[in-house]
């Protein structure tokens, strides 16, 4: 082989061009596999994917969904109303046999109707001492407890976002002043302050709400919302402040400030959107706390106004006949425990799925 042919052979081997004859043709199965492209994903989609893999969180979510839908829709078609005293019908004598019926037990008049061949809707959980269907009272009490927990958490969210974002972004004396207020509220005994405020507000609001649209809601529920607005925003404010402090030195925030953007615009457009996952998780964990607070206040007689039921007031009323009708206490206690446990487990699942610190 001549020297020139050797050089050309070496140059051919060093060439960047690919010789297709050196490769085995791909099979049809390999070609189909190669054209399959992975769909694009986002942080939200990635978090949802991780959440769906968490079986405990998903079971908790479906339990919450079933309880919520039942609390909303069951009273719409149930033949009994939560305040209806079945033994006191207009134009008829009082029928005391409706009082204290056990589960699936019928009164004397209902048994007479059944003997005549008429259909009578059963009392699944029996009736209470006033002859009211206990099942619909538990369902309606669940609706009230869930509604109070949800709206109280929204109040905490709004106040905590406002105070925490201002404190974290402003810094300096403003931050120090707000944090000292937070420290003072944290130092107060929670239970004592809640009971004290509930007692004072109950007496104060009862007379002022008469004749107003808020009277239908009840002074006790309004006082609950005021208590949450006064005492329970501090954790959310601290959380948001910490997130704002860690984000306000980022380059995109400094660029917006250099461009002349105002503080409110920077907070709305840049800072809070980057705190959404943490805020959602904290709000989800706040709901069971609000439900538990409402339940024990109702248990103490400081919750919803009668005859409107809540799970706590049902448990409190059940104490009078505990030895004879223990299921009246067990049923609302189980519902409260199931709601609070499911919400806490679902909140933990959200945190595991969306908290970037846990995923790093």
Model-predicted segments: where are they?
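Alpha-helical transmembrane segments of integral membrane proteins
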Residues: 130-360
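Gly/Trp-centered helix-boundary motif
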Residues: 1-157, 161, 165, 307, ...
């Amino acid at each position: 082989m001549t020297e020139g042919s050797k050089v050309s052979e070496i140059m051919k081997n060093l060439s960047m061009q690919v010789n297709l004859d050196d490769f085995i043709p791909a099979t049809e199965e390999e070609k189909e596999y190669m054209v399959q492209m992975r769909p694009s994903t986002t942080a939200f989609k990635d978090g949802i994917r991780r959440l769906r893999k968490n079986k405990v969180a998903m079971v908790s979510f479906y339990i919450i969904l079933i309880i919520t839908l039942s609390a909303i829709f069951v009273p719409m078609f149930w033949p009994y109303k939560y305040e209806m005293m079945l033994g006191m019908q207009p134009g008829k004598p009082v029928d005391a046999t409706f009082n204290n019926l056990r589960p699936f037990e019928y009164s004397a008049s209902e048994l007479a109707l059944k003997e005549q061949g008429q259909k009578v809707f059963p009392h699944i959980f029996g009736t209470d001492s006033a002859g009211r269907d206990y099942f619909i009272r538990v369902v309606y009490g669940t609706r009230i407890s869930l509604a109070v927990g949800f709206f109280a958490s929204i109040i905490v969210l709004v106040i905590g976002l406002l105070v925490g974002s201002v404190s974290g972004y402003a810094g300096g004396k403003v931050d120090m002043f707000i944090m000292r207020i937070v420290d003072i509220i944290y130092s107060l005994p929670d239970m004592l302050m809640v009971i004290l405020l509930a007692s004072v507000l109950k007496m104060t609001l009862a007379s002022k709400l008469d004749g107003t649209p808020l009277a239908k809601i009840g002074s006790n529920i309004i006082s609950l919302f005021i208590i949450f607005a006064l005492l329970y925003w501090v954790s959310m404010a601290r959380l948001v402040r910490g997130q704002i402090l860690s984000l306000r030195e980022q380059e995109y925030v400094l660029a917006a400030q250099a461009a002349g953007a105002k503080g409110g615009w920077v907070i709305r457009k840049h800072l809070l959107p980057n705190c959404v996952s943490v805020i959602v998780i904290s709000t989800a964990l706040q709901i069971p706390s609000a439900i538990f607070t409402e339940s024990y206040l109702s248990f103490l007689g400081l919750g919803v106004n009668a005859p409107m039921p809540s799970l706590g007031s049902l448990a409190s009323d059940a104490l009078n006949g505990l030895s004879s009708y223990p299921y009246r206490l067990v049923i609302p206690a189980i519902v409260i425990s199931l709601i609070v446990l499911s919400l806490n487990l679902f909140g933990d699942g959200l945190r595991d799925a969306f908290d970037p610190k846990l995923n790093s």
